[in-house]
């Protein structure tokens, strides 16, 4: 976003003391502080072993944010379904519509046992199909920058939902899940500054926010290590 707005349209030179640059510095400071806090907490606290505890909603407001993100993702998928001509893309968009409720219900899925685990696979299938279709449609384009960020965002969202789905199969890797969710958020937000379709913006925006919320839930549910029992 800074690169796209910092340069003067007439001279082509970067503008000095641009507000976006000041904001970027402030964001970097906040990111550094958040990483410092996170690294300290992950050294002392442990992730719960049970998915019900690891994905439990800490606050009701968090659930509403997830629902809003899911609605945005569903709107984007519906937009793609009606606007795209490709049959494969329509199939991917339909999977996206069906996957949006899974995002909203992600913290409740562990309660449903095997059915919840099966539902968690649906977003993985959606992003897999979307990634394949998107690459197929753009493989002949020699200008990688025109679609590179969007395909990267799709891939990172795929990685994030794969790591979240692993919780339902008792194969959770908390640190990898947190890293994948943050990558999904960053690449999705970066894609919003490109000239992509409204549907893709909504889908990536919704899933980017949703995976970020799930990342926060995972971190928030870290617990102190159990005290060691004295043995004599």
Segments (PLM) and residue ranges:
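N-terminal topogenic module of multi-pass integral membrane proteins
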Residues: 1-92
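C-terminal transmembrane-bundle signature of multipass membrane proteins
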Residues: 1-4, 31-37, 149-232
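Membrane-helix interface and helix-disruption motif detector
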Residues: 2-22, 78-94, 109-115, 132-151, ...
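Canonical alpha-helical transmembrane segments
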Residues: 29-46, 99-108, 158-165
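Structural signal for membrane-spanning alpha-helices in multi-pass inner-membrane proteins
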Residues: 36, 77-80, 103-107, 215-218
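A residue-identity detector for tryptophan
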Residues: 36-37, 64, 112, 130, ...
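Membrane-interface helix-boundary motifs at transmembrane edges
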Residues: 46-58, 105-118, 166-175
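Alpha-helical transmembrane segments of multi-pass integral membrane proteins
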Residues: 60-80, 89-104, 117-134, 150-159, ...
């Amino acid at each position: 976003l800074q690169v796209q707005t910092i340069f003067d349209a007439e001279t082509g030179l970067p503008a000095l003391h641009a507000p976006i640059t000041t904001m970027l510095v402030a964001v970097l400071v906040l990111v550094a502080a958040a990483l410092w806090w996170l690294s300290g907490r992950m050294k002392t606290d442990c992730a719960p072993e049970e998915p019900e505890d690891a994905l439990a909603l800490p606050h009701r407001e968090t659930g509403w944010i997830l629902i809003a993100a899911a609605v945005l993702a569903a709107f984007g998928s519906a937009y793609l379904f009606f606007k795209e001509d490709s049959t494969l893309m329509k199939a991917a968009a339909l999977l996206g519509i069906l996957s949006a409720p899974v995002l909203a219900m992600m913290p409740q899925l562990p309660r449903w046992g095997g059915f919840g685990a099966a539902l968690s696979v649906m977003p993985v299938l959606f992003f897999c199909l979307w990634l394949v279709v998107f690459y197929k449609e753009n493989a002949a384009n020699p200008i990688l920058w025109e679609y590179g960020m969007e395909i990267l965002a799709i891939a990172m969202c795929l990685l994030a939902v794969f790591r979240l789905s692993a919780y339902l199969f008792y194969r959770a890797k908390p640190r990898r899940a947190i890293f994948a969710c943050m990558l999904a958020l960053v690449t999705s937000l970066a894609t919003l500054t490109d000239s992509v379709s409204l549907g893709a913006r909504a889908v990536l925006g919704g899933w980017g926010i949703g995976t970020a919320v799930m990342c926060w839930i995972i971190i928030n549910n870290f617990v102190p290590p159990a005290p060691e029992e004295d043995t004599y």
